[in-house]
Design a protein with these regions (language model features):
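Conserved GNAT-fold acetyl-CoA-binding loop/helix
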Residues: 33-55, 66-68
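Short loop/turn motifs at secondary-structure junctions and domain boundaries
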Residues: 58-63, 147
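Acyl-donor (CoA/ACP) binding surface of acyl/acetyltransferases
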Residues: 1-33, 70-177
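Juxtamembrane helix-loop transition sites at the ends of transmembrane segments
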Residues: 48, 54-57, 167, 172
Length: 177
């Protein structure tokens, strides 16, 4: 799948990660509300951003991973990100994060819905996401975006050096949203 470089619903814009996002991304990676749920360095450096940028660009070229920075229409500051990674049988797994300026305004939920719509338009038949059982804001976002809770995968993800459970959520094109 060759994703478009930008998507918009008129309120949010999803665009590619750029070099000039470096300061905002590094700051977001240091945010305790983000770092608690992701495996990333405790004190990210320019080298970590460079590595992320390489992964994002390689994923887009191969079609295995689609990363977007979330911004508001009419503004260009990164507020968060949404990611879709190709999994087995043509399914995709979504992930998202919200920086401090992107929280509590519904923008990341809109971004997730926009990406879901684009993937379904391309013929993807199933989307999944996984949340930590204690990450209530992420679970609430999944529900607002129309995802259905399927169950718990025990010890299925690594987080800060330990295996932890994950709640599995799914969304099909025909699901009500």
């Amino acid at each position: 799948m060759k994703p478009p470089s930008t998507l918009t619903d008129g309120v949010v814009v999803l665009r590619e990660l750029r070099e000039d996002d470096r300061a905002v991304v590094l700051s977001t990676m240091c945010d305790p509300l983000v770092a608690a749920w992701l495996n990333m360095p405790a004190d990210p450096t320019d080298r970590d951003f460079d590595s992320l940028l390489r992964v994002v660009r390689a994923g887009r070229v191969s079609g295995e991973r689609i990363d977007y920075v979330v911004t508001e229409a009419g503004a260009d500051m990164a507020l968060g990100s949404v990611i879709a990674s190709r999994r087995h049988r043509g399914n995709y797994e979504l992930a998202y994060l919200a920086g401090a300026d992107g929280r509590g305004r519904g923008l990341i939920t809109r971004a997730v819905c926009l990406l879901c719509d684009a993937l379904f338009e391309e013929g993807v038949g199933r989307l999944e996401l996984r949340t930590h059982p204690d990450n209530e804001p992420s679970q609430q976002l999944a529900q607002r975006a129309g995802f259905r809770r399927e169950g718990v995968e025990r010890a299925s993800i690594w987080l800060h050096g330990s295996r932890v459970d994950a709640i599995v959520w799914s969304l099909l094109p025909e699901d009500p949203r």
